[in-house]
Amino acid sequence: MVTQVTSFSKNGVSDWYIQRMSSYVMAAYVVFLLGFVLFASDLSFEVWSALFGQTWMQLATLVTLLATCAHAWIGMWTVGTDYLRGRTMGPKGDQLRGIYQVVCGLLLVAYVLWGIKILWGN
């Protein structure tokens, strides 16, 4: 049986809201970047570096990265609990799902740490 222990919020409605809000954050970030690319008169490395050197842009990027990871975790958790279970995968389905969730979690943590290193590293 699938438990809610590894769910993001223990509640399907809350997970749904988190995914919707995170998608709005990602969409706003993409629209801003697209507008910047389209309307920047000189899109050079210096201009791009200056944009991402601003603290507000670093924070916006970090918030978007965290929103993306929350969105991804909920989606991957849903895929794992729907398809990687005993009924669909046989007697090892629950173990496979556990491994899958650990790998997904480790990858998302690595992506966040890597993003922080890129944003504020030397």
Regions found by a protein language model. Name each.
Residues M1-N122:
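Membrane-embedded alpha-helical bundles that constitute the cytochrome b-like, heme-associated redox core
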